[in-house]
Amino acid sequence: MSTESMIRDVELAEEALPKKTGGPQGSRRCLFLSLFSFLLVAGATTLFCLLHFGVIGPQREEFPKDPSLISPLAQAVRSSSRTPSDKPVAHVVANPQAEGQLQWLNRRANALLANGVELRDNQLVVPSEGLYLIYSQVLFKGQGCPSTHVLLTHTISRIAVSYQTKVNLLSAIKSPCQRETPEGAEAKPWYEPIYLGGVFQLEKGDRLSAEINLPDYLDFAESGQVYFGIIAL
């Protein structure tokens, strides 16, 4: 009921009462009705304001109404957090002792293979069909720039059970050097990270690999800088 309706009801009630002139009883009744009307209007106005400005009422978790405002990775993480924990997941890290190659390891404190995912021949084997978030990061490090142009590549590939051909799913190329370090000049260090990530429909038995072209430039100074993984959505 609106505030205006309440005021009209009170006024009609006052008009319906028998009017008495003079005397202390009539004065007390008028005072009582005036006080009651004021409290009723004040209470209704306060309730209306509280409801209107959302001070009271049901609390709802607010998210952007437009799904496009939420990043794909955020949507994937939110969806995964609401599902059972028996979905396939893997996170493997690079072996810092493997010289001249990028070798993935799962028997480490910061690595994980769960719910059917296997690491076989340096590839992740998908245990079941579905949508997967695939990701990988590498970090390159060098000292100075040689005369030959340095091109660093990082690629995630898939060999499907339906067709035994390697197909690139994600790939990136970076060049850390714009020009050669002049002779006699100080060779300054450079760093180049490359991150890849995307969502793909995979089949049971698919094999996934994450590879680079120049493993000698990999930086293993800190644990967890080079990794590869999948998460079933």
Swiss-Prot record:
CDD domains per the UniProt record, alphabetical: TNF
Positions of disulphide bridges: C145-C177
Modifications after synthesis and translation: The soluble form derives from the membrane form by proteolytic processing. The membrane-bound form is further proteolytically processed by SPPL2A or SPPL2B through regulated intramembrane proteolysis producing TNF intracellular domains (ICD1 and ICD2) released in the cytosol and TNF C-domain 1 and C-domain 2 secreted into the extracellular space. The membrane form, but not the soluble form, is phosphorylated on serine residues. Dephosphorylation of the membrane form occurs by binding to soluble TNFRSF1A/TNFR1.
GO molecular function, one term: tumor necrosis factor receptor binding
Membrane-spanning segments: 36-56
Record-level GO BP terms: extrinsic apoptotic signaling pathway via death domain receptors; immune response; positive regulation of canonical NF-kappaB signal transduction; positive regulation of extrinsic apoptotic signaling pathway; positive regulation of NF-kappaB transcription factor activity; positive regulation of transcription by RNA polymerase II; regulation of biological quality; regulation of developmental process
Domain THD: 88-233
UniProt cross-references to Pfam families, sorted A to Z: TNF
Transcription listed as a keyword: no
Chief localization: membrane
Residue numbers with lipid attached (N6-myristoyl lysine): K19, K20
Site entry (Cleavage), positions: S34, L35, L39, L40, C49, L50, L51, H52, A76, V77
GO-annotated cellular components: cell surface; extracellular space; plasma membrane
Coiled coil, from the record: none
Known function: Cytokine that binds to TNFRSF1A/TNFR1 and TNFRSF1B/TNFBR. It is mainly secreted by macrophages and can induce cell death of certain tumor cell lines. It is potent pyrogen causing fever by direct action or by stimulation of interleukin-1 secretion and is implicated in the induction of cachexia, Under certain conditions it can stimulate cell proliferation and induce cell differentiation. Induces insulin resistance in adipocytes via inhibition of insulin-induced IRS1 tyrosine phosphorylation and insulin-induced glucose uptake. The TNF intracellular domain (ICD) form induces IL12 production in dendritic cells.
Family assignment from sequence similarity: Belongs to the tumor necrosis factor family.
Protein name per its UniProtKB record: Tumor necrosis factor
